[in-house]
Amino acid sequence: MKKIGFIGIGTMGLPMASNIINKGYSLSFYDPFVNSDSVNTLKNLGGTEKTSLSELSQNVEIIITMLPNGDNVKEVCFGKNGLIYQDNKNFVLIDMSTINPNDSIFINEELNKNNIKMFDAPVARLVQNAIDGTLLIMVGGNKDEFKNIKNLLETMGSDIVY
């Protein structure tokens, strides 16, 4: 099983991350803005809390972001101590946030310059669907590499559209 890092364990991210753990993946998570109840929920399921992006990115193969807006995703990727500045860049970023397409294009181009692969995979439906693992996930990215993330996406969604 792949080692997963998850950034953003709020209303949608918490159940998505929970489903990943419940399907047997090793999951580490980081979210500086979340309440302790979400942290405790994931810890009780077997998730590992990380205290920085540096710590989160050390031993993961895939990092998922589920953040409120494009500025948050850009900050995680390119801000001070962002993902592009970490020692391990041998991961795939799956941004599942619903953000402006221009932000996604910019983020993808900048990550590519740093040899980091990215998929844009926003979700649709309700919080209950996130809890049930029945989200609609619309994926954009390298088609040949899509097969490497499809099983992971299926832990969170019942309808995966490439």
Model-inferred region functions:
Residues 53-118:
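Rossmann-fold NAD(P) dinucleotide-binding segment
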Residues 1-66, 91:
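NAD(P)+-binding Rossmann beta1-loop-alpha1 motif at the extreme N-terminus of oxidoreductases
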Residues 37-38, 73, 128-132:
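A short acidic, helix-capping loop that chelates divalent metal ions and anchors anionic groups
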Residues 4, 99-162:
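Rossmann-fold dinucleotide-binding core
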